[in-house]
Amino acid sequence: MKKMVLAVCCCAALLGGCGDRYEAKSGLTPYKEEIFAMDTYMNVCAYGEQSQKAVEAASAEIQRLDELLSVTGESGDVYQLNQLGQRQVEADTLAVISRAVEVSKETDGLFDCTITPVMKLWGFRDGNFRVPSSEELAEQLAKVDGSKVHMEGNTVTLLDGVTV
């Protein structure tokens, strides 16, 4: 959990801090790296003596979380959880799923981490985009229910075929 919090803080600080104005005022040259993770391009940037080390550490953590939380990466917790329906997961995965379930409750289901079947239907997972029929949507929406995600210790259980 501490690693995840650190990664998020680093990313927020790094992603927002690479403007030309800071470089001009400080006289420091940034170390920058562009990565692709979590289905998006990211620019990681840092200034100072340890900038390269900081950027490499942040990039490695982003890649680790991407693999761990990926719906399609077969070695990750989320992929395996979706395949098995129940699984012991790493602390970072548990924290993300736990918070997602909380947000689902707080928003009365407007945000729901079990939307995966609908995402697949529209082609967001494999890039084969299409507009599904009303019948297909109704069938897949029946599989969306954040209340069917249960956690006990570090074990997550997905009931009735829901996926995250």
Task: Name each model-derived stretch.
Residues V5-L6, C11-V164:
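A contiguous, well-ordered beta/alpha segment that forms the leading edge of an enzyme domain
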